[in-house]
């Protein structure tokens, strides 16, 4: 990783944490011998409803030396061991949750319209971008190959599962409401626009405002205020207004119709070309 001139909103990511995260990413590069292509914040700080003690959910994609891809026993395609690697070093921090995917895995999941990867690429808080032109290329091809129905079903499934698991009691955690409301609004946006929804929750609310009653807006504004001031574990009494809105949205059935996308052969050609460009540039 070279020096990055990216500076983020310090209200969401304080400057000292920005530097610590960039240093931690350089440390991972050195320890693992790969090249990080990009790194983004992916959690509540990216969604813009973080608590004072929220984690920093850093997600990155990397590429290895090309020889690693020629072996019948390739290296692991995921880096999930940051806490273990950093233990006892200057980079150890309980608030840092850092996970990376090999570019080959990322492109394979892009073919499957993986919502996590799509959110990373569209995230508002990049910690590092190795090559802005290549990053823009990744974003461009993701928009060409991503199918909206899997994205829609992902958000609907997330909302349904979180509602059943977390919002059935009389006392619930603030953030669990948002883990249902955000994906419901994201699913609405996908259905209405056939495109990727904004990652920032404030922007998402604005572009889906027609589905929100005044009473719901008041309850949601109150929830957001408490959520951003309270600790992650803080709870609240169940809100009947929020629950009624959620239940009504979950009960809605839609007929999702999406036009034809690129053929499997076209997608393969795009992804293979992208992978080869990265190997030529960073695969030594």
Where are the language model's segments positioned?
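A basic- and aromatic-enriched beta-loop-alpha substructure that forms the phosphate/nucleotide-
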Residues: 73-157
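Conserved nucleotidyltransferase catalytic core and NTase-mimicking acidic/glycine-rich helix/loop elements
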Residues: 133-264
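Acidic, carboxylate-rich catalytic segments that either coordinate divalent cations
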Residues: 259-284
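Helical scaffold of the NTase/Pol beta-like nucleotidyltransferase catalytic core
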Residues: 1-40
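Short loop/turn segments at secondary-structure transitions that flank enzyme active sites
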Residues: 62-67, 109-116, 161, 186-187
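Catalytic metal-binding acidic patch
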Residues: 43-96
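Glycine- and acidic
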Residues: 2-11, 166-168, 255-260, 284
């Amino acid at each position: 990783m070279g020096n990055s001139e990216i500076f983020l909103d310090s209200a969401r990511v304080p400057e000292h944490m920005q530097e610590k995260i960039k240093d931690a990413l350089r440390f991972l590069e050195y320890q693992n011998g790969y090249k990080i292509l990009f790194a983004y914040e992916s959690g509540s700080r990216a969604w813009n409803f973080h608590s004072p003690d929220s984690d920093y959910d850093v997600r990155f994609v990397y590429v290895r030396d090309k020889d690693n891809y020629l072996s019948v026993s390739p290296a692991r395609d995921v880096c999930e061991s940051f806490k273990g690697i950093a233990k006892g070093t200057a980079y150890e921090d309980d608030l840092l949750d850092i996970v990376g995917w090999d570019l080959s895995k990322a492109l394979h999941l892009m073919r499957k319209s993986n919502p996590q990867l799509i959110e990373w690429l569209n995230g508002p808080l990049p910690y590092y971008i190795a090559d802005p032109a290549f990053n823009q290329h990744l974003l461009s091809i993701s928009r060409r190959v991503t199918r909206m129905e899997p994205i829609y079903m992902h958000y609907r499934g997330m909302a349904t599962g979180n509602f059943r698991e977390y919002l059935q009691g009389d006392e619930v955690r603030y953030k669990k409401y948002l883990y249902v409301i955000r994906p419901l609004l994201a699913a609405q946006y996908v259905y209405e626009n056939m495109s990727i929804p904004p990652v920032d929750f404030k922007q998402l609310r604005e572009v889906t405002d027609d589905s929100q009653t005044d009473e719901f807006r008041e309850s949601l504004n109150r929830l957001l205020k408490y959520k951003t001031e309270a600790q992650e574990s803080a709870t609240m009494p169940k809100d009947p207004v929020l629950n009624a809105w959620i239940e009504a949205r979950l009960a809605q059935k839609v007929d999702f119709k999406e036009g034809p996308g690129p053929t499997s052969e076209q997608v393969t050609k795009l992804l293979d070309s992208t992978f080869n460009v990265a190997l030529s540039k960073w695969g030594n």
